[in-house]
Amino acid sequence: MSTDESEDVYSDLYSIISQVTSNTANDIEQLPYALTFKTSLIFVGATIGGLLFGYDTGVISGVLLSLKPEDLSLVVLTDVQKELITSSTSVGSFFGSILAFPLADRYGRRITLAICCSIFILAAIGMAIARTLTFLICGRLLVGIAVGVSAQCVPLFLSEISPSRIRGFMLTLNIIAITGGQLVSYVIASLMKEIDNSWRYLFALSAIPAILFLSILDFIPESPRWSISKGDILYTRDSLRMLYPTASTYHVNSKIKQLIIELDKLRLYEDASEPLLVQSQSVIRYMDSSTSGTLSPPNIKRLSSNTERTSNTMSSSSAYLSALRGPAPNGALASNKKKRHRMEPRTIRALIVGCMLMFFQQITGFNAFMYYAAIIFSKFNIKNPLLPPILIASTNFIFTFFAMYTMDSLGRRAILLRTILIMTVGLLLCSVGFGHDQVNLLLISVVIYVAAYASAMGSVPWTCVEFLPLNRRSFGASCIACTNWLTNAFVSMTYLSTINTIGDENTMLIFAFFTVCAWFFVYFWYPEVKGLSLEEVGRVFDNGIDVHYVFRTYH
């Protein structure tokens, strides 16, 4: 590894913290893990953000059906105004996705989620009591900010607090919470459709999960990786005891030592003059058998004294602290304090692929059905136009499970190439259904489209962050999320106006055109990375985009 590569790979500490998983204290990870009531409460509580994400993005379909002009002091509620109400959440989510990582790194994952839930509550109340269009749009913008932050922070938090044995399950649970939240919003809207001003109740109900999260906040620990990066050993130890209730003091302390070793190695590339425990930006809380205190950097002698006297927290501390000073490997500049902002060409190519695939995820029209399904099917004089949206959301929910169990086994590229073709067929059938007023054909074709979408396109673009080197993942995840929300906002802001201008059937043809473009994009530029290490993923983008690297190398 060259000096430039070393500086580039290790320059961003906090983006790497979230990736320190596989080599962190194997002893504690190998313990049998049994979910207790308290640990279940922690993990379920952490997924409340995903539930709110799904509910607040799905609820708008039922709201638009029950919202009346006089409710907002209007003479008429135009399609453009409906589009503004709908798309304002996506606009807010764009800004939320930008704020997510800075907030999570500065205040911690737990506090950031608490801030999100507070915003969810405030926005829910504001939207429920809104008497003007402007006030309602402001409420939707506010909830969008919370959605954008939680969409980024919840998976990060879960990946950092989950034991390796259940990490995949917990991340899956978050996806289930999102799609389940959308389904719940449709079901509740259907049950409340005969109630006057039901849209106010639909908005108000979104405050309940947020209140539940705040009520159990004291039982949810901070990410150990974040707290150790801040030098708070005492809090890290308490968090680990909550997350691993069967672990002994030895296992907990081993985990802490391994975390410190990993993080200190990373910091060597920024400033190797002092190990993590005595770096100038860290204030270490340290508890030994008789005392607890705050150790500031100048108190090096006191630190040495404490570590020598402490047997439970850190054994052989003098040798341990000396070991942390190990040389930066491969000639990296140990005293480098400058942050490198230049991205390598291969990183730029990888980021473009991720953003483009996310663009196609949204421009192919999925959220047009999610947001406006009730309006779409109300044109066909269906007794309950909220029943088709429930079927659509149920299809999305069920086939999301299919995606989670096939992406790694079949490969993302292979499943994308197959399901995008099915999406295209579904949209073409939608166009026929609209053109001939065949509601049954329309419903079947939408279900086909949504099933294919949920099987790959709904999930795969979010995994493109794995194309990026560790020190660019936070930035790359924000870019990919921003692409999602901006394209989402564009589709939701123009859909009703478009169908009024060129008709439903032609709008479906436009979506079908973009799915064809997406297929060619995947075929020529989206590589398969199944089973590749981080270094090998980088090689895929070394000279252009080698989409056949896996097959040429391993088959």
Curated annotation (Swiss-Prot):
Main localization, broad class: membrane
Record key words, sorted: Membrane, Sugar transport, Transmembrane, Transmembrane helix, Transport
Region annotated Disordered, chain positions: 289-313
Lineage, opening ranks: Eukaryota, Fungi, Dikarya, Ascomycota, Saccharomycotina
Residue spans crossing the bilayer: 40-60, 84-104, 119-139, 141-161, 169-189, 201-221, 357-377, 385-405, 414-434, 441-461, 475-497, 507-527
GO cellular component assignments: fungal-type vacuole membrane; membrane
Ranges in the topological domain labelled Cytoplasmic: 1-39, 105-118, 162-168, 222-356, 406-413, 462-474, 528-555
One Pfam entry name: Sugar_tr
UniProt topological domain (Extracellular) ranges: 61-83, 140, 190-200, 378-384, 435-440, 498-506
Domain of life: Eukaryota
GO BP field: myo-inositol import across plasma membrane; transmembrane transport
Family, per entry: Belongs to the major facilitator superfamily. Sugar transporter (TC 2.A.1.1) family.
Keyword presence, Transmembrane: yes
Cellular location(s): Membrane
Protein's recorded name: Probable metabolite transport protein YDR387C
Protein's membrane topology: Multi-pass membrane protein
Molecular function GO labels: myo-inositol:proton symporter activity; transmembrane transporter activity
InterPro entries: MFS_dom, MFS_sugar_transport-like, MFS_trans_sf, Myo-inositol_Transporter, Sugar/inositol_transpt, Sugar_transporter_CS
